[in-house]
């Protein structure tokens, strides 16, 4: 289902009677749904006929013994259900909810959270989002993602805040979102960076956002350019948070520390976060390491139990006394953490390690660049070369001159080995359903090309330095 009020009733009811819900986005296709049915051994699917999804589900179910429950049946059940439901006894360690990951690097995995999970979101709502009684909080996520649990249910209610539900079909525009915030006196807003990248192009003077005092961002790393432009438009400093479907918020910018544009802040209370090298040793400040959570004092409240029905993968991430996130970051001398990327996203070129996020942040400062994904492509002389796949702003054209300008722009602002030796201009970037850039897909598409540099230089740009080397 989309963002519908029935979701909250259904979730609470299932928690109470012992049914394990698996919230899913209504943007799935039949193949996606079939995969989820098989992996989870689903017994029933509750669907609200919003567009295509009912037919997709029927196709996915086929002859399987899976009960399909329609919105009419749900409405009838809600209207006739007793005031109280008999609660099925459970332990904190029992599975409460399962989420499928968005599948940025592999097939979606089933993340199992137990009944202590809601308490983990006290950090999320009270200390990251700074919510309290009287707040009206607006998290954009639809109900099929773990971000809905982060921003629309457990922690917010524990904080005494009102949750604002705004449903829309398709893609909401900046006008849609800003109008909703103005008309409903929203005091707190949370969305992924892709939404803020859209909002900063709007004319904020047309909307009365005087009630808005807090804004948060999570989902991917936030480029400093977006932070600064949003603050200039609203006077509000974005508070970045970091976590995964497998966790609640585990690092964030709290009310007690000054936001640093692009930093995800400091570890949450109860989370012993350490940055480890490939040998499992802590790294010093300024050195990139994998974000790991120490388990020496047990699982932090809000950390998942494991991957449902996948002991092999669970043991891969829970090892040597740590939960290994697969994400890498560095810590500065003030104790702030800075996201670098997924381990798989790091580009190793000429013996250096390049963070895609760092190069993307620099490119986004250029007026021509609307969206960008930086990846590595094979290069015989360097191992990997840095490539930028770019969506241009209106009125800009992807010429050789612009390619040189963008390369010079990066070289002037960061180490020379980080500049993109190859630039490709595209109409759009491949995204997951949850709005994250699919860098792995870009790498896969690039790897399918016969050779790396020569065939693409006339199409997507090659620096003069590279041509001389050839």
Question: Model segments located where?
Answer:
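ATP-dependent adenylate-forming carboxylate-activation enzymes
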Residues: 1-2, 19-37, 49-53, 141-143, ...
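Hydrophobic alpha-helical segments in the ANL/AMP-binding
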Residues: 5-24, 33-34, 125-127, 147-159, ...
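Structural core segment of the AMP-binding/adenylate-forming
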Residues: 9-12, 16-79, 89, 186, ...
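AMP-binding/adenylate-forming catalytic core of the ANL superfamily
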Residues: 28, 35, 47, 189, ...
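Conserved pre-ATP/AMP-binding loop-to-beta segment of ANL
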Residues: 81-100, 106-107, 130-136
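Active-site loops of AMP-binding adenylate-forming
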Residues: 115, 204, 232-233, 244-262, ...
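Conserved AMP-binding/adenylation subdomain of ANL enzymes
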Residues: 119-187, 202
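Gly/Ser/Thr-rich phosphate-binding loop
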Residues: 154, 158, 186-191, 200-260, ...
């Amino acid at each position: 289902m989309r963002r519908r009020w029935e979701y909250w009733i259904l979730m609470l009811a299932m928690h109470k009677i012992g049914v394990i819900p698996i919230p899913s986005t209504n943007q799935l296709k039949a193949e996606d749904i079939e995969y989820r049915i098989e992996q989870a051994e689903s017994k029933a699917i509750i669907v609200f006929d919003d567009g295509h999804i009912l037919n997709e589900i029927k196709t996915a179910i086929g002859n399987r013994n899976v009960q399909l429950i329609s919105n009419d049946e749900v409405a009838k059940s809600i209207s006739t259900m007793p005031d109280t439901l008999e609660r099925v006894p459970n332990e904190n360690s029992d599975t409460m909810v399962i989420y499928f990951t968005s599948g940025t690097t592999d097939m979606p995995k089933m993340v199992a959270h137990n009944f202590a999970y809601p308490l983990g979101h006290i950090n999320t709502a009270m200390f990251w989002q700074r919510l309290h009684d009287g707040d009206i909080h607006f998290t954009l996520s639809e109900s099929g993602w773990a971000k809905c649990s982060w921003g629309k249910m457990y922690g917010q209610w524990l904080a005494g805040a009102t949750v604002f539900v705004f449903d829309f079909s398709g893609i909401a525009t900046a006008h849609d979102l800003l109008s909703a915030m103005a008309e409903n006196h929203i005091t707190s807003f949370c969305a992924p960076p892709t939404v803020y990248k859209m909002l900063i192009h709007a004319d904020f003077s047309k909307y009365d956002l005087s009630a808005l005092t807090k804004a948060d961002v999570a989902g991917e790393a936030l480029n400093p350019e977006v932070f600064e432009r949003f603050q200039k438009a609203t006077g509000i400093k974005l508070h970045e948070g970091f976590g995964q479907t497998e966790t609640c918020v585990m690092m964030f910018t709290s009310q007690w520390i000054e936001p640093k544009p692009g930093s995800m802040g400091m570890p949450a209370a109860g989370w012993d976060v350490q940055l480890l090298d490939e040998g499992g040793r802590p790294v010093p400040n300024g050195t990139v390491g994998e974000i790991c959570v120490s388990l020496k004092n047990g699982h932090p409240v809000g950390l998942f139990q494991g991957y449902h029905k996948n002991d092999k993968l669970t043991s891969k991430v829970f090892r040597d006394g740590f939960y290994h996130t697969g994400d890498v970051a560095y810590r500065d001398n003030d104790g702030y953490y800075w996201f670098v990327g997924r381990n798989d996203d790091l580009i190793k070129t000429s013996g250096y390690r390049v963070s895609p996020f760092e190069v993307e942040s620099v490119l986004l400062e250029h007026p021509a660049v609307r969206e960008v994904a930086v990846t590595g492509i094979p290069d015989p002389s360097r191992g990997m070369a840095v490539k930028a796949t770019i969506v241009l702003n209106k009125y800009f054209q992807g010429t050789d001159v612009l390619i040189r300008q963008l390369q010079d722009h990066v070289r002037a602002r960061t180490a020379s080995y980080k500049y993109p030796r190859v630039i490709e201009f595209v109409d759009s970037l491949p995204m997951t359903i949850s709005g994250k850039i699919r860098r792995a897909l870009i790498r896969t598409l690039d790897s399918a090309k016969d050779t790396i540099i020569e065939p693409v230089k006339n199409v997507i740009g090659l620096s003069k330095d590279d041509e001389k080397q050839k």
